[in-house]
Design a protein with these regions (language model features):
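Conserved GNAT acetyl-CoA-binding A-motif
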Residues: 141-143, 170-183
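Conserved beta-hairpin
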Residues: 73-90
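Conserved acyl-donor/pantetheine-binding loop and adjacent beta-alpha core of acyl/acetyltransferases
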Residues: 87-149, 155
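A short beta-loop-alpha structural element at the N-terminal edge
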Residues: 21-35, 43
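Conserved acetyl-CoA-binding loop-helix of GNAT-fold acetyltransferases
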Residues: 147-150, 156-169
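Conserved active-site alpha-helix within GNAT-family acetyltransferase domains
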Residues: 161, 173-175, 184-201
């Protein structure tokens, strides 16, 4: 990832998030965010697939914890408050996927031991597809919404909007494209509400 991006765009975005009254989550609390995602992702198609067809909370939790810890230096990861009812994780332009060695060093081995070696093939397959699509539509010149999760008990209270709007305003200010992919049909209208356009759809 371009060093200039780290030095300019990421700090700018983090500053916007703090000014909006949101909570930049320190690395030592990323495990708690993984639990929020684990709760929110119940029956999420992609995680069901990662888990071999049936959702496994521990696999989902470990996967999210490893992913967040791997990207923490480059990502903008923030929550609605210190209570961590919901969070968002964005990656700046130039992101082309997590690197293998950092992934393994941040808990990947534990994930493999729990879920079995087949999960590595699934992760690589999905990330290859996701990054190919991202390159097609943005040429990797985008802010990439890697994750938006709100715990089930906190859903329907406007937390997703609270998390999304400051970052979308920042991207408008910087004249930057925002990009994401979702694997759940019911999520499409949510993101369209925030101004995203649907560019790709393939039936599983």
């Amino acid at each position: 990832m371009d060093e200039l991006v780290r030095k300019i765009e990421v700090p700018l975005a983090r500053n916007i998030i703090q000014k909006a009254g949101l909570y930049l989550v320190p690395k030592e609390r990323l495990g708690e965010l993984a639990e929020v995602a684990m709760d929110a992702y119940l029956d999420y198609p992609l995680h069901n697939w990662f888990c071999g067809g049936k959702y496994d909370e521990e696999t989902s939790r470990l996967l999210m914890e490893v992913s967040l810890k791997t990207m923490t230096e480059d990502a903008v990861i923030y929550a609605d408050s210190e209570e961590l009812n919901g969070f968002a994780a964005w990656l700046p332009l130039g992101f082309t996927g997590n690197k293998t060695l950092p992934f393994m060093m941040n808990g990947g081995v534990k994930l493999i031991l729990h879920a079995g070696p087949s999960i590595i093939g699934k992760l690589l397959t999905y990330e290859t597809l996701a990054m190919k699509l991202k390159e097609t539509y943005t040429n990797h010149v985008d802010w990439y919404l890697y994750n938006l999760s709100v715990s089930r008990k906190a859903q329907g209270k406007g937390i997703a909007s609270k998390l999304m709007r400051p970052m979308l305003q920042f991207c408008d200010m910087e004249n930057m494209v925002c990009y994401l992919e979702t694997n759940k049909e019911s999520n499409v209208s949510l993101y369209q509400h925030y101004g995203f356009q649907r560019n790709f759809h393939k039936q599983a």
